[in-house]
Every structure is written in C-alpha cells, then in structure tokens.
Amino acid sequence: MKMEEFSPPTSPNNHVIVQANPQIAAALSTNSPMQQGIPPQGHQNPNEQQQQQQFVGQPPMGGMGGPMRMQMPQQQIRQMPYPSPQMRAGPPPPQQQQQQHFQQMGIPQQQQPQQFTPNGQSMQMQQRPMQMGMAQGPGPSGHLMGMVGGPPPQHMMQQQGGGGPPQFVPNSSPMPLPPQQIMQVQHQQQHQQPPPSQQIQQPPIPQPQQQQAPPPQMIPAAVPYGSIMEKSKLDDLMQQISSTTVLEENVKDVLVEYADDFVSSLIDKACKMIKNREVKKIESRDIEFILKNVYNMPVVPRAASHNFGSQTEVIDLSKEKFVPTEAHKQRVALLKKQIKKL
C-alpha cells in the first residue's frame, strides 16, 4: 500500500509565516523520513541551507537584542558515548557569541584593549560594536536602541598599531568615594588650612612727654627788621665825632630810615646798570661810579683807578674839595689848645 504524499496548502500568508518563525519554515520544508529515506552522510537539503541563510541574515528586532543563536540543520546526530572537549569546557561565553553574531551581520567591531589581572595573566576585554546610534551597556551584550553605557573600566590599556607594549590609561571620570572617606578628606583639609590671622591689639606705647620749654622772651630790638644801621652804632659814631653831642630818639629814627632808603636806591641803580651789561653780579666799581656821578660823593682811595670811560682816566684825590665841618673844627681847636699847654 502506497502512502499518500501530504503537501501543505498553499496560501499567500505562508511566506509571511516562514519569515516570521524560522522553525515553522524549517518544519514545513523538511520531508518526512518515510518519504525521503535515509539521507547519505554529508548530504544537506537545499531548502534547509536557504532557510539557514535567511535566519542568519535577519537582524534582531526590538527589545534588548541578545545574541542570536545559530540554528543547526535538523539531521540525525549520533550520540557520542563520551562528551566532546567543547562540551566539557561548557558553552561558549556570551562575548564569543556576540562576536560571532555581529560578524554574521556584517557590523564592524572595535577591538578593545587587553586588561591585565594582578597575577600577570592577560584577560581580553569585551568586544563591542562601535556604530552610530548604539551605546554600550553594562551587561555582557550591547544594547542597540538608545541604551546608555555604563562606566568605563578604571584601568585600560591602549594597544599600539605596531604591536608595542600596552600602556595604562587612567580613568577620565573619578570613582565616587563613600561618604565616610569624603568626611575624612574634608576634615583633613580643614586641619591643613591655616587659622585666620588674629589681629592682636597692642596697647599704645606711652610716649614720654617732652618738657615744654618756656617761650623765649621777646626783647624789643633797637633796630627794626631789615634796617642797616642800629641806634647804638649811631651813638658810637657821634662820640667819635663829638663827645658833647647827644642825639635824640626821633633824630636817630630818622637817620636809620634815611640810611635804609639811601642803600635801597643805591642797590636799585646798580642793578639797572649791570642789567645793561648783561651780568648778574654787582661789583664795587659799580657802586663807586654811582656815588661819584649821581650823588657827587668822593670815592675811597683803594678805588682811585677804574675802567669806566677811558682806560687812561685816573681820579686825582688832590682835586677833590674838602669842606671842613663844625665838628672837625672843634677837634682841631682842642688839639691846638693841648699843644699850647705843653
């Protein structure tokens, strides 16, 4: 008796179901062993190979996107009497599964540097894809859709292109400290800070009182300030001329004022004269010239020759007229009397 071949009904939704669930597609495409018979070794159904390629090429949709597992062709596998070395070692780590998954999807990966344990053994860092729009997650498998990456490891090693020795790179973001350590650090900083300088108000030093000297007694001067001649000198001069003559106070004041005015006018005329010569020093010959030409006064013998006018001009004292005064006449009379007594 022949067995009737059973074929699934064709419908437009079969293609959608096959793409949505690869296991159903594999079951539908696989013939029963009674129809197909025992396949030879190394033989693989072309429908299974095509479905396997479609399953591998399809990217994971939505969600957390864990590593995709490869679907092996449904073949009769003989059970091994003892486990294989791969089974002994256990299932491959999720890192290798993830690496295989991204290699099949054609996504480039960035090779992470190696990290060394304290025992000196190198431990390969997890390889994660570096693609626009994807972020690294803290778990073993990277998340694709907008997941925020966890903190990077503290000590990383940069692998050089020439295969040089790895270099330690310090972590850019410091690890948060526990609150106890933070309090200890703040306490140490407060102790290290110098205390604010305290201004010590020193008592004012008593200054020794200086003994105030009594104000000097103002003695009225006989000569006013700036006067050239004093009254006492006038008395001495009068005693030389006539011992019997006595000057009154009013006469003395007038004589002092007259002497000051005479000296001031004499100096004023001398300054005007040297100004014409463009010099800044008054000489004795300037005063002699003014006394002779302006006041008609005889000059002293030491200034008999001068350079004013012609150089050959010489003053002759014999030509000067001497007019004796009354005091001179009295002195001469006294001398004559004394001579007669002798």
UniProtKB/Swiss-Prot annotation:
Keywords: Nucleus, Transcription, Transcription regulation. Residues 12-35 have a biased composition (Polar residues). Residues 39-59, 67-89, 96-146, 180-192 have a biased composition (Low complexity). It comes from the Eukaryota. Signal peptide: none annotated. Residues 230-297 form the Histone-fold domain. Disruption phenotype: RNAi-mediated knockdown reduces nuclear localization of taf-4. Pfam families: TFIID_20kDa (PF03847). InterPro entries: Histone-fold, TAF12, TFIID_TAF12_dom. The keyword Transcription regulation applies. GO terms for biological process: RNA polymerase II preinitiation complex assembly. Residues 1-221 are annotated as: Disordered. It is found in: Nucleus. Residues 193-218 have a biased composition (Pro residues). One of its GO terms (molecular function) is TBP-class protein binding. GO terms for cellular component: nucleus; SAGA complex; transcription factor TFIID complex. Interacts (via histone-fold domain) with taf-4 (via the histone-fold domain). Interaction may facilitate the nuclear localization of taf-4. The histone-fold domain mediates hetero-dimer protein-protein interactions. Part of the general transcription factor complex TFIID. Plays a role in recruiting taf-4 to the nucleus and thereby activating transcription initiation by RNA polymerase II, as part of the TFIID complex. Belongs to the TAF12 family. This is Transcription initiation factor TFIID subunit 12. It comes from Caenorhabditis elegans.
